[in-house]
Amino acid sequence: MKKQVECERLRLMVFESAFDLGNDIDHLLLKRYGYDDQKYTFIIPIKENFFEDGHLKVEIEETVRGKDLFLLTDIGNYSLTYNMHGFTNHTSPNDLMMQLKDGIGACNSHAKYINVVMPLLYAGRQHRRISRENLMCGMILRELDQNRKMKSFITFDAHDQGVEHSIHNMEFDNFFATNIILENLIHDVDCSTLENLVFVAPDNGATGRRNVYLNSFNSSFIHREAGSFVTHRDYNHFVDGKYPILSHDYCGNEDLKGLLFVITGS
């Protein structure tokens, strides 16, 4: 069994939903601080218990007193299963969000600082109120913000950066993948193809990143207004001889209008 790094204050609480991500980060940290990754680890051991009645409990098996704790969870990971009343259920974002909150509570305020790393922002599309509905994303962030030990919340490609307005104490770090996508396009696609790109935004959700691509490649674009009564259009005259790239913000359900935005070109 690996030993905890003793002379460093940093610790990782890695839930099973983010197991691979946590191991990669642990390996990089050990390499950075000069520890043998075969003997040491920054990951504290925990038990994740799902009970037959649907309740859950997180148990921490090592002390976190005075530590800078980073909790890693992937609420979009539905591959995990648990048994409830004789049925096998896949974990939902709600299950994993409650597990995260239980893990924070298990720290018992002993950690010096608590940081949350959540690649997919929970309820990220519920960022504004249109009718009689709940602002779940902002409510969760505000609830975490009220914990005096919370230092930062880290996510990637949030649907709307404006959700950070719901918090006042902890930091909200939102990292975009746009630059990485541009680097891979330049590296993997030949120059003649890059000159003939056309970027497509099926609704208003991805117009921001689409504009970054347009400015980078000086390309043309196609945009379908959200809520348009026209579902199918013929865009062949726009993409004839071009290489279309569909830029969308989120594929959350089978009914998504953007999935009906299909381009075919000769």
In which residue ranges do the predicted regions lie?
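PRPP-associated nucleotide enzymes
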Residues: M1-S266
